[in-house]
Amino acid sequence: MERVNNYKLCVALLIISMVMAMAAAQSATNVRSTYHLYNPQNINWDLRAASAFCATWDADKPLAWRQKYGWTAFCGPAGPRGQDSCGRCLRVTNTGTGTQTTVRIVDQCSNGGLDLDVNVFNQLDTNGVGYQQGHLTVNYEFVNCND
């Protein structure tokens, strides 16, 4: 009986460890974030007009869905890639100021981090350091978009 209980305890601890590892894989710290001139307000939040990677799957979503959050391209070190990341949301925090916002992934990038819409970048860059450096250092975590 004691062996069975030890086995169950080991299995439970393994499952808990796996869940914690999966949760950790959905966030990253000290990530480089640049900006892109999507300016969705000027193109009626049209993912096709922006030539966004995720347009294939998300361009026909309701306007309210496309407007709900600022846009970003995602190529961060942790989390899903490609189509699996499309439409997902990130809570992004400027590590220098603590300023946070939620963004929606609409595109891919190749800078190893995030490529935020310029409006989102400016919203996070409350002290101007990102503009001066040409990039921000941010933390991100995948969050529920509440759609």
From Swiss-Prot:
Keywords in alphabetical order, please: Cell wall, Disulfide bond, Pathogenesis-related protein, Plant defense, Secreted, Signal
GO annotations of cellular component type: extracellular region
Reply yes or no: does the keyword Transmembrane apply.
no
Question: What's an example of a GO molecular-function annotation for this chain?
Answer: RNA nuclease activity
UniProt keyword Glycoprotein present: no
Please report the stretch or stretches of sequence annotated as the Barwin domain.
26-147
Identify the InterPro entries for this entry: Barwin_CS (IPR018226), Barwin_dom (IPR001153), PR4 (IPR044301), RlpA-like_sf (IPR036908)
Q: Which cysteines are joined by disulfide bonds?
A: 54-86, 75-109, 89-145
Q: Where in the cell is it found?
A: Secreted, Cell wall
Q: Where is the signal peptide?
A: 1-25
- Can you tell me which residues the record assigns to a coiled coil? none
Tell me what induces its expression: By TMV infection.
User: What is this protein's name?
Assistant: Pathogenesis-related protein PR-4A
